[in-house]
C-alpha cells in the first residue's frame, strides 16, 4: 500500500509487479482469543499456513502449529507476517521485543490490532528502518493518541490508523 500511495502521489503508473498470494504465506497470530481465532480462521480459509501463540496449547481451528508466547523469537524467522491481537497485561508488555524483532524474517509484515504496549515501539522503528520488518499496519500504540513527534508517522513502510479496528457501524451511531 505505501508503494502504491507513493506512485499515486507522483502520478506515476508503475510497471506491474508480482504480489505474494495468501495461500503461499505463513502467518503468526500472536494471541488466540476471540479476535485472534477469527483472524486465524479467515487466513486459513485463504489457504494460509497459520501458526498461533497459546499459553495453554489448546487446538484452534485453522491453526496448524501452536507455540508458547515465550518462544516468539524462535518462530518469527519462519513467517511472512505477524498479526498481534493480544490485550495489554503485565505478561504481554513488550512481548514483541527487540530480541523478537531482530529474529524476524527480513521484509516480514507486522499488523497490530491488539494493544500498543505489546510491541517495543523503539525496536519496531529500528526494525522498519533496517528492513527487517518490511511493512507495518498499526492500529494501536503504547500511548494514544500517537505523539506527533513519533518517527512512525514518517516511515514510508507504515500505515497508521487511530485505534479504529474495532469500530463497528453500531458503535459509530
Predicted regions, residues:
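Rossmann-like adenosine-cofactor binding region
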Residues: 57-151
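Glycine-rich Rossmann-fold phosphate-binding loop(s) that bind the pyrophosphate
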Residues: 32-33
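Phosphate-binding beta-alpha-beta segment of Rossmann-like dinucleotide-binding domains, i.e.
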Residues: 1-26, 41
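N-terminal Rossmann-fold NAD(P) dinucleotide-binding loop
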Residues: 36-37
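Conserved acidic E/D residue at the C-terminus of a beta-strand in Rossmann-like folds
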Residues: 54
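C-terminal helix-to-coil terminal segments
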Residues: 144-173
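Residues at the starts of beta-strands that form the adenosine-phosphate
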Residues: 26, 48-49
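Gly/Ala-rich phosphate-binding loop of Rossmann-like dinucleotide-binding domains
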Residues: 40, 44, 128-129
Amino acid at each position: 500500500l505505501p508503494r502504491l500511495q507513493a506512485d499515486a502521489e507522483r502520478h506515476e503508473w508503475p510497471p506491474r509487479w508480482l504480489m505474494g498470494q495468501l495461500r503461499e504465506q505463513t502467518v503468526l497470530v500472536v494471541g488466540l482469543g476471540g479476535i485472534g481465532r477469527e483472524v486465524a480462521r479467515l487466513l486459513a480459509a485463504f489457504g494460509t499456513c497459520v501458526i498461533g501463540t497459546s499459553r495453554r496449547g489448546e487446538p484452534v481451528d485453522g491453526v496448524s502449529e501452536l507455540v508458547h508466547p515465550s518462544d516468539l523469537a524462535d518462530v518469527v524467522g519462519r513467517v511472512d507476517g505477524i498479526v498481534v491481537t493480544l490485550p495489554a497485561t503485565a505478561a504481554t508488555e513488550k512481548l514483541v521485543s527487540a530480541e523478537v524483532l531482530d529474529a524476524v524474517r527480513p521484509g516480514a509484515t507486522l499488523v497490530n490490532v491488539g494493544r500498543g504496549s505489546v510491541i517495543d515501539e523503539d525496536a519496531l522503528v529500528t526494525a522498519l528502518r533496517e528492513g527487517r520488518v518490511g511493512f507495518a499496519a498499526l492500529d494501536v500504540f503504547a500511548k494514544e493518541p500517537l505523539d506527533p513527534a513519533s518517527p512512525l508517522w514518517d516511515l514510508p513502510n507504515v500505515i497508521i490508523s487511530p485505534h479504529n479496528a474495532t469500530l463497528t457501524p453500531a458503535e459509530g451511531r
